[in-house]
UniProtKB/Swiss-Prot annotation:
GO CC annotations on file: nucleus
GO BP annotations listed: intracellular zinc ion homeostasis; kidney development; protein maturation
Residues involved in Zn(2+) binding: 105, 107-108
Phenotype of gene-disrupted mutants: Although mice are viable and do not show visible phenotype, they display non-Mendelian inheritance. Mice show impaired zinc homeostasis: they are sensitive to dietary zinc starvation and show decreased weight gain when fed a low zinc diet, due to failure to access existing zinc pools. Impaired zinc homeostasis leads to mitochondrial dysfunction. Mice also display kidney defects, characterized by hydronephrosis, hydroureters and duplicated ureters.
Reaction catalysed by this enzyme: GTP + H2O = GDP + phosphate + H(+)
Similarity comment text for this entry: Belongs to the SIMIBI class G3E GTPase family. ZNG1 subfamily.
Location of the CobW C-terminal domain: 271-374
Taxonomic source organism: Mus musculus (Mouse)
CDD domains in UniProt: CobW-like
Protein name: Zinc-regulated GTPase metalloprotein activator 1
Length: 393
């Protein structure tokens, strides 16, 4: 896992207390596969206020599904029977209390990010096999996901399985097209952009035309995530659990997904999905530089002179001298490059296919920069230049 680059001042301050780095032993493929059998998956459930994410979690808590799921609720609808069982006030402060339900699920209420609740939950390991974490309606799921992603790299007992975003059919379009001051991306749009699974809820409350408009807008923002439509947040668990959106198992289905990525233009062009495929292999160090310029330095401009902001990155790439297809994943300033379980059949098949979700993205500029910095084929190489790159700060 590669974290964000610190400023020069921060680096100098950090260097004074920086411990000596020591080499660590990396796990082989078999050990990594075993980890996913023993670790507990975490799915983040997000969505704008009133979209139905708490209804979804309450549905899971009360249905019989033969799964032992621990659910961490951050918000409750008024009059919730589950809320009354969980919200225990002491000294004017709400604290968490784990409640074991009849269907084998565990549930608690928290008023923070849920990380503390998960730490306490791990003491009950053996009583559950899955964790669902609800974020607040205005939360950026990418920030929460990044914490779990980094934690997994440090040998945690949990791993991030996926991000589910619930969208209200009646008010979703209004939320997604709401303009924020100073050019900021609104919360609902960011939640859709980061989702691996998007649930369009309350479809019975709108006309087919309204639903089509919402579908088009969602697809223009996130052309990679799977979209399901539902009423009253009822969905089969197989559609939202065990997505493996961030681990090596995602490479098995990722190739098919990349072939059907939707890149329809977004109405206001603030958040879009762009994708391209380049034949041949890349040098790993060159690929790292390309990604770091996008995610860390944020110094790549589009044709209008605006710096591109990548919120989500995903792709399958061919790395020179490696037989496996490599999975590249990125959220905000974190990214990872790891081997998939699939090998390239032959050199003629090798290619790099990338999907970017973000704002001010320009496919032509991204593809040319990739070719300049990464592509191995000599006929695809162009001389390095500074065009399209912002000055470093």
């Amino acid at each position: 896992m590669l974290p964000a680059v610190k400023t020069v001042e921060a680096e100098e301050e950090y260097a004074e207390d920086c411990p000596e780095l020591v080499p660590i032993e990396t796990k082989n493929q078999e050990e990594e596969n075993l980890d996913f059998i023993t670790k507990i998956p975490v799915t983040i459930v997000t969505g704008y206020l009133g979209a139905g994410k708490t209804t979804l979690l309450n549905y899971i808590l009360t249905e019989q599904h033969n799964r032992k799921i621990a659910v961490i609720l951050n918000e409750f609808g008024e009059g919730s029977a589950v809320e009354k069982s969980l919200a225990v006030s002491q000294g004017g402060e709400l604290y968490e209390e784990w409640l074991e339900l009849r269907n084998g699920c565990l549930c608690c209420s928290v008023k923070d990010s849920g990380l503390r609740a998960i730490e306490n939950l791990m003491q009950k390991k053996g009583k559950f096999d899955y964790i669902l974490l609800e974020t607040t309606g205005l939360a950026d799921p990418g920030a929460v996901a990044s914490m779990f992603w980094v934690d997994a790299e440090l040998g945690s007992d949990i791993y991030l399985d996926g991000i589910i975003t619930v969208v209200d059919s009646k008010y979703g379009l209004k939320h997604l097209t709401e303009e924020k001051p100073d050019g900021l991306v609104n919360e609902a749009t960011r939640q859709v952009a980061l989702a691996d699974m998007i649930l369009i809820n309350k479809t019975d409350l709108v006309s087919e035309e309204e639903l089509n408009n919402l579908r088009t807008t969602i697809r223009s923002i996130n052309g990679l995530g799977k979209v399901l439509e539902t009423q009253r947040s009822r969905v089969h668990l197989s559609n939202i659990l065990d997505l493996h959106a961030y681990d090596i198992l995602s490479g098995i289905s990722l190739q098919k997904k990349l072939q059907h990525v939707s890149t329809a233009p977004h109405l206001d062009q603030s958040i879009v999905t762009v994708t391209f495929e380049v034949p041949g292999s890349a040098k790993e160090e060159c690929l790292n530089v390309f990604i770091q310029n996008l995610l860390w330095e944020k110094n790549v401009k589009n044709k209008d002179g605006h710096c591109m902001e990548v919120i989500r990155l995903k792709g399958l790439v061919s790395i020179k001298d490696k037989p496996q297809q490599m999975i590249v994943q990125g959220i905000h300033e974190l990214y990872d490059l790891e081997e998939s379980l699939v090998n390239w059949k032959d050199d003629a098949e090798r290619a790099c296919q990338l999907v970017f979700i973000g704002r001010n993205l320009d496919k032509d500029v991204l593809q040319q920069l990739f070719l300049t910095a990464v592509a191995e084929a000599e006929e695809q190489r162009t001389a390095p230049g500074r065009d399209g790159v912002c000055p470093s700060h």
